[in-house]
Every structure is written in C-alpha cells, then in structure tokens.
Amino acid sequence: MATEEAKIKLFWLEKSRAQNILWLLEELKVDYEIEVFRRSSDMLAPPDLKKIHPLGKSPLVSVTAPGPSSEPIILAESGFITQYLSEHFGHQTTMMPKRWKDGQENKVGGETEEWLRWQYTLHFVEGSFMSTLMMAVVIGMLKSNKIPFFLRPITSMVANQILSSFVLPNLKGLLAFLEKQLETSGGDFLCGKNLTSADILLSYGLVSVKDRLEEFGSWPVGGPKKLYPKLFAYIARLESEPGYKKSFEKIKEIDSSLEIEY
C-alpha cells in the first residue's frame, strides 16, 4: 500500500477524544482532512455521525488506499485507530517502536521491550485506565450542582461511599503503576526515550483528570502530585509537546468557537 498517497479523514467531534487522534496525525506527518461535528445542546454526539459508523461515536477516521476503485475503511475506537494509523504510517516516525530485536524477527519472545510496552499500553488505556476514569467522573457527577439540592446530600453520600471503597483505590493503583512504568522506561516517556502513539492515547485521560483527582476522595498530605511526581512531570511534558499544541491550533484555525476538551 502506497501509504504516502492514502487519503485520511478525521471526523472530529468537539469535546471528544478525537483531539488526541488529531495530535497523532500531526506526529505522523501525513496529509489529512478534518470534518467537524458539534455536540447538541444535551452534549450528545449529532445523529450524522451514525451515517459514518453505526454507533455514532467519536473519534472516527476514514482511510482510503490509492486507486480509483478503493473504498474508504472506517476506523472506530481510539485504541484501534491509534494502532492502525501507527502501523501503516508510523514507520518513519517514533510513533511505533521497532518491533523485533535484531536476528529474532518473528520469534516468540523476539519483541523489543519498547514495542511490548507500546502494545500493552494501547490495551491498558482502553481497558483498565479509561473505564476506571470514566467511572470516577460519572459517579462524581452525583455530587455536582446538576443534582437537585434537596437530593444532593443523599446522592453525595452514595457517591462518596462508592468512590472511597472501590473507585479511588483502583484509580490510585493505576496511577502508581504508571509512575513505576515511567521510572523503569529508560527515558521520559512510557516506552523509552521517544514519544509514541501510546503516550498520545493515554494523554487524553491524564490531562483531563489531573486537576480533578482530589474531587474523588481523600489523599495523603501533598496530594497526588507528591505521590506521583514522575507522572505529573510526564503530563507536563506531554502538554509542552509541539504536536499537542499544534492540534489545538488546527481546530482554532477552522473555527475559534469550537470547544476542545483535553
């Protein structure tokens, strides 16, 4: 496949994980189009996205191989999109680490440590991490001003019990794991010295929750930043990456009124 000639289109929904796919596309140095979708007044995705993929979720990406008879391939789910784009377009970048140790190609156990970390992290983000994070955010909404004030004491009590007994202990375990991964990576990023698409996939959850962690329950003196210094330094590095900043600029160039969540 002549990947340099493939046509890539990102269906971008405001306040969604489509933003970190945009960052990935910037890092891959490929040409791509963006079609923008706005959320409805109830913050749901518009029905038009279901015309592209039956679930109507974001992000969505279409990839069309070169040739007059080629049909677009529709990619859905952040992890799958990230892996597909990295494998097809990332070989001249750092987005996907080298897979095989020299002389051990296609052998069991022949994979490099960097590639194993990359592959694992793609699944970790979509499995353990984002599910726990979303649970914390959704349960935390039971304490918000959106709940009628006369019900809020009850819903807050229930939310606090669930958060303290189950969600927060799990979340702390995940953050401690990421702290250890950074400590042992041999570089500034999860897979080593270079930024990869696994870092980009993880970035959305980390950046969006970094200032909200103390809402989910009690922490030792000093809070999350003291417990996970390497992780918070890592988040700051991600936010300072040129591609991260460029992804915001791209959307603002299209329409400065669009809401970006990260």
What does each model-found stretch correspond to?
Residues 25, 61, 178, 199, ...:
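Residue-level signal for nonpolar/aromatic packing positions in well-ordered secondary structure
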Residues 121-236:
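GST-like fold's C-terminal all-alpha helical module
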Residues 1-9, 251-262:
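Eukaryotic N-terminal targeting leaders
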Residues 93-99, 133, 188-192, 218, ...:
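Short, hydrophobic secondary-structure boundary micro-motifs
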Residues 2-161:
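GST-like domain detector, emphasizing the conserved glutathione-binding G-site
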Residues 236-256:
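Charged/polar, low-hydrophobicity segments characteristic of intrinsically disordered regions
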Residues 89, 182-186, 242:
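A general structural signal marking secondary-structure boundaries and capping sites
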